[in-house]
């Protein structure tokens, strides 16, 4: 039969606008008065002004799990990563048949970064501040960006084994680099999610042009990583 693919917690337009404005950190736009809509639309105004509350009863009855149970959380996920108008977001998802413990252990071992990084970057791990990776560990690398030597230091945060961790650049070529790795059991395997928030140096001057080149490089790096994971047996 038919299934209503809608939110389990519907809201009215007024609340929708309020939550969206809050997430975007802007002032809410004043709603158009009902009388103005009736004058402009006539009888069609009833369609615009009337409320329809639809609930996803069938999928809820089948124990479907919603990623976001309310609109506020959904907006936070969409917009709260952005601290500056110069921040950029890159996201990638990939599924692998490997078990969660094996996948997490692989990605949380800094030595495997060399295998996951294109050779053109000449990426080398120089060491880390703790024997094992944990919250607060610093990892030191050297690499070449378009042939230019660079050094990079990452700080490990959000350390939740088998669930997630993030590496934050505290020294390197970007004004900001926050890479969050998420791991989730799915369909007998693991869904890998990468979320990268980055800010370019000199982003106020020619930022869009510079971002075109940098984003192309980021896509190349993650495409290479995707192909490596595809080859896992």
Name these PLM-found stretches.
Residues 166-220:
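Beta-strand/loop substructures that line and gate deep hydrophobic ligand-binding cavities in soluble
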């Amino acid at each position: 039969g038919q299934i209503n693919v809608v939110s389990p917690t519907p809201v009215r337009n007024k609340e929708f606008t309020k939550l969206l404005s809050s997430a975007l950190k802007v002032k809410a736009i004043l709603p158009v008065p009902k009388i103005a809509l009736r004058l402009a639309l006539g009888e069609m105004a009833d369609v615009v002004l009337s409320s329809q509350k639809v609930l996803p009863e069938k999928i809820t009855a089948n124990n479907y799990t919603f990623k976001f149970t309310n609109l506020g959380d959904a907006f936070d996920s969409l917009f709260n990563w952005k601290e500056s108008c110069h921040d950029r977001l890159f996201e990638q998802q990939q599924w692998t048949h490997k078990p969660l413990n094996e996948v997490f252990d692989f990605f949380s071992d800094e030595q495997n970064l060399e295998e996951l990084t294109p050779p053109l970057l000449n990426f080398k791990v120089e060491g880390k501040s703790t024997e094992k990776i944990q919250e607060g560990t610093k990892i030191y690398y050297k690499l070449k960006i378009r042939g230019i030597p660079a050094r990079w230091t990452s700080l490990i945060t959000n350390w939740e084994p088998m669930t997630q961790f993030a590496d934050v650049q505290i020294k390197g070529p970007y004004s900001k680099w926050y890479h969050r790795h998420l791991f989730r059991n799915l369909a007998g395997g693991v869904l890998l999610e990468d979320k990268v928030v980055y800010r370019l140096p000199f982003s106020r001057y020619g930022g869009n042009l510079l971002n075109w080149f940098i984003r192309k490089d980021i896509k190349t790096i993650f495409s290479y990583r995707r192909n490596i994971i595809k080859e896992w047996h």
